[in-house]
């Protein structure tokens, strides 16, 4: 069956430096039960497949990502109805969302 993914692209300025380090680490795991099936490093950011888990925000909490990052994921998935979040260093900042200078 064909699956359609809805996506939003936004700046990595919306995440903290600490969350960036966590995402980098999680996206580079090599073990079979790692997070690389739903957190992907792109070279200039990350792709998050939020439909890979029933409760992705709870999973992010268990993995140690900040409340600010989890709130961003909730906001993007609810406001824009997306299942794929592309955080990219070259993307635009979205209005009304916090940004971090790192």
Annotated model-derived regions:
Residues 63-102:
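Short, compact, well-ordered microdomains
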Residues 17-52:
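An N-terminal amphipathic alpha-helical segment
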Residues 3-10, 39-60:
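Short glycine-rich, basic-tinged beta-strand/loop micro-motifs
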Residues 23, 56-60, 69-73:
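Generic structural signal of hydrophobic/aromatic residues within well-ordered alpha-helices
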Residues 5, 28-32, 67-69:
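Short amphipathic alpha-helical surface micro-motifs
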């Amino acid at each position: 069956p064909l699956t359609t993914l809805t996506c939003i692209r936004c700046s990595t300025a919306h995440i903290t430096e600490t969350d960036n380090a966590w995402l980098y680490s999680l996206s580079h795991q090599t073990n079979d039960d790692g997070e690389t099936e739903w957190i992907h490093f792109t070279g200039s950011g990350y792709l998050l497949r939020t439909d890979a888990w029933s409760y992705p925000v709870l999973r992010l909490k268990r993995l140690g990502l900040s409340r600010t990052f989890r709130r961003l994921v909730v906001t993007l998935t609810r406001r824009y109805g997306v299942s794929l979040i592309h955080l990219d260093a070259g993307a635009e900042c979205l209005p009304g969302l916090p940004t971090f200078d790192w």
